[in-house]
């Protein structure tokens, strides 16, 4: 018989926030219950918070809808940010010069799993 699936995943790819900044927020929720993680994200004043919150809510919805998991029993088992494509731009400087500007993007991944009590 097939093994029961007990985790669900959600990804946001090519999000316009630097991975270094997104990792500060992702590190706060790893290992927490989903209710606690949502509360943390709601009150964290960082630009990455709404993005990570949206991905977390998507992972919870995937768990409930696709795998019939109970949201009260879920916790954030994996949460990480990988580097996406970098948009390269130039800022004009004095005397006809230009400085490079790297607009970094991120791939945000959140996996929620059922607690084994």
UniProtKB/Swiss-Prot annotation:
One of its GO terms (cellular component) is cytosolic large ribosomal subunit. This protein binds specifically to 23S rRNA; its binding is stimulated by other ribosomal proteins, e.g. L4, L17, and L20. It is important during the early stages of 50S assembly. It makes multiple contacts with different domains of the 23S rRNA in the assembled 50S subunit and ribosome. The globular domain of the protein is located near the polypeptide exit tunnel on the outside of the subunit, while an extended beta-hairpin is found that lines the wall of the exit tunnel in the center of the 70S ribosome. Belongs to the universal ribosomal protein uL22 family. Keywords: Ribonucleoprotein, Ribosomal protein, RNA-binding, rRNA-binding. This is Large ribosomal subunit protein uL22. Pfam families: Ribosomal_L22. GO terms for biological process: translation. One of its GO terms (molecular function) is structural constituent of ribosome. Part of the 50S ribosomal subunit. It comes from Lactobacillus acidophilus (strain ATCC 700396 / NCK56 / N2 / NCFM). HAMAP family: Ribosomal_uL22_B. SUPFAM superfamilies: Ribosomal protein L22 (SSF54843).
């Amino acid at each position: 018989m097939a093994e029961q699936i007990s985790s669900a995943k959600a990804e946001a790819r090519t999000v316009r926030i630097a991975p270094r900044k997104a990792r500060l927020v992702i590190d706060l929720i790893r290992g927490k219950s989903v209710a606690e993680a949502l509360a943390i994200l709601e009150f964290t004043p960082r630009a990455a918070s709404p993005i990570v919150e949206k991905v977390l809510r998507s992972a919870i919805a995937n768990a409930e809808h696709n795998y019939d998991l109970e949201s009260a029993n879920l916790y954030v088992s994996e949460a990480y940010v990988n580097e996406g494509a970098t948009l390269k731009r130039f800022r004009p400087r004095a005397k006809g010069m230009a400085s490079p500007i790297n607009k970094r993007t991120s791939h945000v991944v959140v996996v929620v799993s059922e607690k084994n009590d």
